[in-house]
Amino acid sequence: MAPGCISGFFGLAQYIAVKSKDLYKYPKEIPYTKSAFTEPVACVVNSVEKAGIAFGQDVLIIGGGVMGLLHVQLAKLRGARVIVSEPNEDRQELAQKLGANITFDPAEGDAIEFVKQQTEERGAEVVFNTTANPKVAQQALDFTAKGGTTFMFSSMHPNELVPTDMGAVHSQERTITGTVSPTITTFYRATQLIAKGLVDVETLLDKAFNYTDATEAFEHGARPETLKTMITFD
């Protein structure tokens, strides 16, 4: 797999030509449907490593999509108690299957108060926002404990300004930061996580289509309830 130093758009090409020094090799038994997750896993490795999660910390992940569920798994590997904010019941169940300790629907009741109840009124030490909704980004700050860090993993769509209580950021010593894309190092670590079976990526594959059914694949992938959709050349 080519690390982050390889850029460009290759469409649905079955093969691309790159220099051998720019590749990480997977064991032969790892199928393409797993190795194709390398880039998203590397992005999440970058995110979680920046957080410096400590054993026993409360980590709250907003969003139960593919990137949110990868955050669940890596935060668990770091020894955190994981809380997931996700309105879809099926994705809540999937988050629990992948290691989430607590899941809840943020649209039901007072979400901020719920998180406080689960964390002895503190809030979460680390909050990852994996959704693109600016209103949810604002809520992420309210979930964050005193001295905690809010990570904006997702870009905003639309890219609107997010109102921020800077007084609370000051008085509660909160940190707001972002993470984007993998590095060469996190790309390598992603290959190790997948090759050694330390992350479950197969569960995140909603459906794989042969390239001859590409139109159907795009239509399937455009549905909001789907997870990962792949096109294979088998």
Name each model-derived stretch.
Residues Q138-D142, I184-D234:
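C-terminal hydrophobic helical "lid"/dimerization subdomain
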Residues M1-L23:
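Glycine-rich phosphate/adenylate-binding loop and adjacent beta-alpha elements
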Residues A51, F55, E93, K97-T175, ...:
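Glycine-rich cofactor phosphate-binding loops and adjacent beta1-alpha1 units
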Residues Y24, L60, I83, T149-F151, ...:
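Structural detector of well-ordered beta-strand residues that form the stable sheet scaffold
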Residues P31-E108:
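Mid-domain Rossmann-like dinucleotide-binding core that forms the NAD(H)/NADP(H) cofactor-binding site
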Residues T175, S181-P182:
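Glycine-rich phosphate/pyrophosphate-binding beta-alpha loops
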Residues N88, M156, P182:
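Residues in the short beta-alpha loop(s) of Rossmann-like NAD(P)-binding domains
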Residues D22-T33, Q57, R122, Q172-E173, ...:
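Glycine/charged-rich beta-loop-alpha catalytic/anionic-binding loops adjacent to active sites
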